[in-house]
C-alpha cells in the first residue's frame, strides 16, 4: 500500500497543505521546528487515530482554529481508499471510503504505518510502559478486535481501581462489586495477554534473521513476554483466566490496602535477550540500537504476513542516529518494497540510489514545496 496524496487543514503549524507523493521514497528536508515532524505525525495520526508524541489531541489543532482535518488517498492492491480524520475539541471522527466509522477501533487498520523516530531507540532501554505501548499500537494495526478488548480492559481496570479506592477509604464495605469487576477484568485480560504472546512470538520470528544479518551472524536475538502469571500453556484462555483468579484472590487484601489493581497486562513487559543476556541491562548501546532497528524492520514483514500488504515506513530524523552500516542495512531492507518517508535537515548521508528515486519536499514555517 502507499499514500498517493495528503491534505492537511489546520493541523499543528499547517494552515493548509496538499501533497502528491511518490510511491517509493519521499524525502522531507528542512531546518528544525519548521514542520517536518508534524507532517510525519499527521500521516501516523491518519493511520492510528492518535499521535505518537502526545495524548492531548488539542495540541494537534492549529492554535487559532476549532478543528484539524487530515485527508489521504490510500492505494491498495484492490483499489483506492479515501480516508479522513477530523479532530475537534469534542473528539475524533474517522471516515473510510466516505463512510463514517462508529468506533475508532473500526477506523484503525485501513492504513498501516510504522514510525521509527529517535525516541524509538529507547524501546529497549526505556520503561515497561514504552514497550507495552509499542505492543498495543502495533497489534492494533492488524487486529481491530484487540483494540476493542484493550479499550474494554482499560475501562474495567479504571472502574476496579475506583472501587478499590472506595474500599481503602471505607466509603464502601460490601465487596460483592469487587468480585463482579474482577470476573469481568479476568475475562478480557486473558484475551489481551494471549494476543500479546502471539504477537511477541511472531515478532521474534521476523526479527531474529534481521538482527543476525546486522550483527554479521554474531548475535541471536530472543524475545520474552514477561508476566507474573504461572501457566503451563500460555495460549490457553481458560488457564490464564484461572491463573488471574488465583492471583487476585491472593492479592485481595493488599489491593484494598493500596487502592489499586496489582496484577494484569497493564503491569507486564517484553524482555529482549542477545546471546542469552538481557540487552536492556547488559547490552552495549550498539546492541540496543541493533535490537530496536531489528524490531522495527521485523514489523514490515509481520504486517505483510498478516494483511497481505506492506505498510508505510516513516523515518523521522532517525537516519542521523544510525551509523553508516545500520543505515545502509535499513535502506537496503526496505528498497523497492515499502513506501518510505524520510525527514532530514540535509541530504548528506543519504545514499545516491535512494535520492535518485525519491520525491523531494522542502518545508519552512508550515509551508511545503516539492
Swiss-Prot record:
Broad class of where this protein is predominantly found: cytoplasm
InterPro entries to which the protein is assigned, alphabetical: DNA-binding_RecF (IPR001238), DNA-binding_RecF_CS (IPR018078), P-loop_NTPase (IPR027417), RecF/RecN/SMC_N (IPR003395), RecF_2 (IPR042174)
GO CC field: bacterial nucleoid; cytoplasm
Record GO biological process: DNA replication; DNA synthesis involved in DNA repair; double-strand break repair; SOS response
Record GO terms (molecular function): ATP binding; single-stranded DNA binding
Superkingdom to which the source organism belongs: Bacteria
Keyword annotations of the record: ATP-binding, Cytoplasm, DNA damage, DNA repair, DNA replication, DNA-binding, Nucleotide-binding, SOS response
Location within or outside the cell: Cytoplasm, Nucleoid
Matching PROSITE patterns: RECF_1, RECF_2
Binding residues annotated for ATP, in chain numbering: 30-37
Keyword Cytoplasm in record: yes
Keyword Transmembrane among record annotations: no
Similarity remark: Belongs to the RecF family.
Quaternary context: Recruited to foci following DNA damage; probably interacts with RecO.
Chain's role: The RecF protein is involved in DNA metabolism; it is required for DNA replication and normal SOS inducibility. RecF binds preferentially to single-stranded, linear DNA. It also seems to bind ATP. Is recruited to repair centers, foci that are the site of double-strand DNA break(s) after RecN and RecO; recruitment may depend on RecO. A positive modulator of RecA.
Protein's recorded name: DNA replication and repair protein RecF
Amino acid at each position: 500500500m502507499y499514500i498517493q496524496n495528503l491534505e492537511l487543514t489546520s493541523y499543528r503549524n499547517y494552515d493548509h497543505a496538499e501533497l502528491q507523493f511518490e510511491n517509493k521514497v519521499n524525502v522531507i528536508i528542512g531546518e528544525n521546528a519548521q514542520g517536518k515532524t508534524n507532517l510525519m505525525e499527521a500521516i501516523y495520526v491518519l493511520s492510528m487515530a492518535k499521535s505518537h508524541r502526545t495524548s492531548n489531541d488539542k495540541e494537534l489543532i492549529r492554535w487559532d482554529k476549532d478543528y484539524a482535518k487530515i485527508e489521504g488517498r490510500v492505494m491498495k492492491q484492490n483499489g483506492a481508499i479515501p480516508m479522513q480524520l477530523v479532530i475537534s475539541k469534542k473528539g475524533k471522527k474517522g471516515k473510510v471510503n466516505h463512510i463514517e466509522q462508529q468506533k475508532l477501533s473500526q477506523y484503525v487498520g485501513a492504513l498501516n504505518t510504522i514510525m521509527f523516530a529517535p525516541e524509538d531507540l529507547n524501546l529497549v532501554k526505556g520503561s515497561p510502559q514504552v514497550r507495552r505501548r509499542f505492543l498495543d499500537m502495533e497489534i492494533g494495526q492488524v487486529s481491530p478486535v484487540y483494540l476493542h478488548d484493550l479499550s474494554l480492559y482499560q475501562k474495567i481496570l479504571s472502574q476496579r481501581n475506583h472501587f478499590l479506592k472506595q474500599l481503602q477509604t471505607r466509603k464502601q464495605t460490601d465487596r460483592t462489586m469487587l468480585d463482579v469487576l474482577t470476573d469481568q477484568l479476568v475475562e478480557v485480560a486473558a484475551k489481551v495477554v494471549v494476543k500479546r504472546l502471539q504477537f511477541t512470538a511472531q515478532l521474534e520470528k521476523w526479527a531474529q534473521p534481521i538482527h543476525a544479518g546486522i550483527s554479521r551472524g554474531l548475535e541471536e536475538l530472543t524475545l520474552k513476554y514477561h508476566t507474573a502469571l504461572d501457566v503451563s500453556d500460555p495460549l490457553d484462555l481458560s488457564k490464564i483466566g484461572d491463573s488471574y483468579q488465583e492471583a487476585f484472590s491472593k492479592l485481595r487484601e493488599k489491593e484494598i490496602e493500596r487502592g489499586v489493581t496489582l496484577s494484569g497486562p497493564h503491569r507486564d513487559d517484553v524482555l529482549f535477550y542477545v546471546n542469552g543476556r538481557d540487552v536492556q541491562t547488559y547490552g552495549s548501546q550498539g546492541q540496543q540500537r541493533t535490537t530496536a532497528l531489528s524490531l522495527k524492520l521485523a514489523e514490515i514483514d509481520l504486517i505483510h504476513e498478516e494483511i497481505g500488504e506492506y505498510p508505510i515506513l516513516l523515518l523521522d530524523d532517525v537516519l542521523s542516529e544510525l551509523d553508516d552500516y545500520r543505515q545502509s542495512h535499513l535502506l537496503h531492507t526496505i528498497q523497492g518494497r515499502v513506501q518510505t518517508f524520510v525527514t532530514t535537515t540535509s541530504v548528506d548521508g543519504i545514499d545516491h540510489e535512494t535520492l535518485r528515486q525519491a520525491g523531494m519536499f522542502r518545508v519552512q514555517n508550515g509551508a511545503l514545496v516539492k
